[in-house]
Amino acid sequence: MTLKLYDDAAGTSEVGASLVITHETDLSDNPQDFQLWYAEVDEDTGDNGIFTYEASSNPGVDQISISIGDTTPGSGHEAAEITLGLTAGDLATNTAGAALDIGTSFLSGASNAETFYMRVENAVTTVSNSLELSLAGNALLKSSTP
């Protein structure tokens, strides 16, 4: 199963291992907002919704979620610098650093991609390359769509 993050709705531009964000050291460019799509397009090239994805913990009941990981808490950037939302408006009210629930199931294919928004509010004023923050989905169960 190849669920990936994309920066386009068609699922043609994969985010890859890292999202490059440049910040000013005086923080004058805060915040920076992005729209991303979570999808499986490699195995459903016909965009037919042939697979259904559900949380493996309790399929069809538990939420599929996207969480923010921090490999070095207390050092460099913190998960609290990122806010996730289902809409751009949610970025102003959702809790920074919190996981985002996107539903109990979704279908494969680009047209079924789950879109969400991410706000990055830099709090680090030193010049550096930081790779300690990540986005990840919970474990999913894939089944053929009836």
Residue ranges with predicted function:
Residues 2-45, 49-56:
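Beta-sheet-dominated interaction scaffolds and their linkers
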Residues 3-5, 36-38, 64-68, 118, ...:
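Hydrophobic beta-strand residues in large extracellular and virion-surface proteins
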Residues 6, 42-114:
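Surface-exposed binding patches on compact interaction domains or structured appendages
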Residues 15-17, 27-35, 112-116, 125-135:
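Short, solvent-exposed loop/turn segments enriched in Ser/Thr/Gly
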Residues 15-23, 98-104, 119-120:
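Short structured motifs
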Residues 21, 52-53, 102, 133-137, ...:
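Generic detector of low-complexity/intrinsically disordered segments
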Residues 40-42, 120-124, 137-143:
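Beta-strand elements of well-folded, non-transmembrane domains
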